[in-house]
Swiss-Prot record:
One of its GO terms (molecular function) is hydrolase activity, acting on ester bonds. SUPFAM superfamilies: LigT-like. It comes from the Bacteria. Belongs to the 2H phosphoesterase superfamily. YjcG family. It is an enzyme of class 3 (hydrolase). Keywords: Hydrolase. The lineage of its organism: Bacteria, Bacillati, Bacillota, Bacilli, Bacillales. InterPro entries: 2H_phosphoesterase_YjcG-like (IPR050580), Cyclic_Pdiesterase (IPR009097), YjcG (IPR022932). Gene3D superfamilies: Cyclic phosphodiesterase (3.90.1140.10). The keyword Hydrolase applies. This is Putative phosphoesterase BH1439.
Length: 171
C-alpha cells in the first residue's frame, strides 16, 4: 500500500487554496491542500508499526513552528505547477530531513521547496496567464503548525489520514 507524510494547514488556508485548486488542480478531489513532507512510498503491512513509531519519534523531536505563505510561484520549466510559496523554517526542513532517514528511503525526485500546490498539469498558456494574474494578488498568511499526518492511498487514488502526530514533547 502507498503511504505518505504531509501537514494539513488550517481551514482558512485550505479554503483559499481550494478556491484555486477546484479549477486548476486535477487532484483536487483526491486530497485536501497540504504540504508534502514525504512523497508516496510503499509499505508492507508488517512494516507499518515501525514506521508509525518512527514518525511519532520524529514529530516529538520537532516543536510547533510558524507556517508563512507569502507569494504565488511556479516550478516552470520543470513542471507547469502553481503553488503558494512557504517561507523556509528550520523546523519544517528538519521534519523533511528526518523523514528521509532510515527506515525511510530517499525517494524524493526534487529538492525540498516548501509549498502548497494550487494548480498542476496546466498548459503553458494557462500557467503564464494565471501566474501573471496571481502574482498581482497579495497572498499573505501565517499560522502555527502543531501536527503532521501519515496518510495512505485508497484504491480510487484518494488519500486519507492513517494517524495524526502532534509536534513537540507532550506535557
Amino acid at each position: 500500500m502507498n503511504y505518505g507524510v504531509a501537514l494539513f494547514p488550517s481551514k482558512p488556508l485550505q479554503d483559499l487554496a481550494n478556491s484555486y485548486r477546484m479549477r486548476y488542480d486535477p487532484h483536487y478531489t483526491l486530497i485536501p491542500p497540504h504540504v508534502t513532507l514525504k512523497e508516496p512510498f510503499e509499505l508492507e503491512e508488517q512494516e507499518l508499526p515501525s514506521v508509525v513509531k518512527r514518525v511519532r519519534e520524529i514529530a516529538k523531536g520537532v516543536d510547533p513552528f510558524p507556517l508563512e505563505v507569502y507569494k504565488v510561484d511556479t516550478f516552470y520549466p520543470v513542471s507547469n505547477t502553481l503553488f503558494f510559496k512557504i517561507r523556509e523554517h528550520s523546523a519544517l526542513t528538519e521534519l523533511y530531513e528526518q523523514l528521509h532517514t532510515s527506515p525511510f528511503k530517499r525517494n524524493e525526485k526534487y529538492s525540498f521547496v516548501p509549498h502548497l500546490t494550487i494548480g498542476q498539469n496546466l498548459s503553458y498558456d494557462e500557467l503564464s496567464d494565471n501566474l501573471g494574474r496571481l502574482k498581482m494578488k497579495q497572498i499573505q498568511h501565517e499560522e502555527i503548525v502543531d501536527r503532521i499526518q501519515l496518510l495512505y492511498q485508497l484504491d480510487n487514488g484518494s488519500w486519507t489520514v492513517y494517524e495524526t502526530f502532534k509536534l513537540g514533547k507532550e506535557e
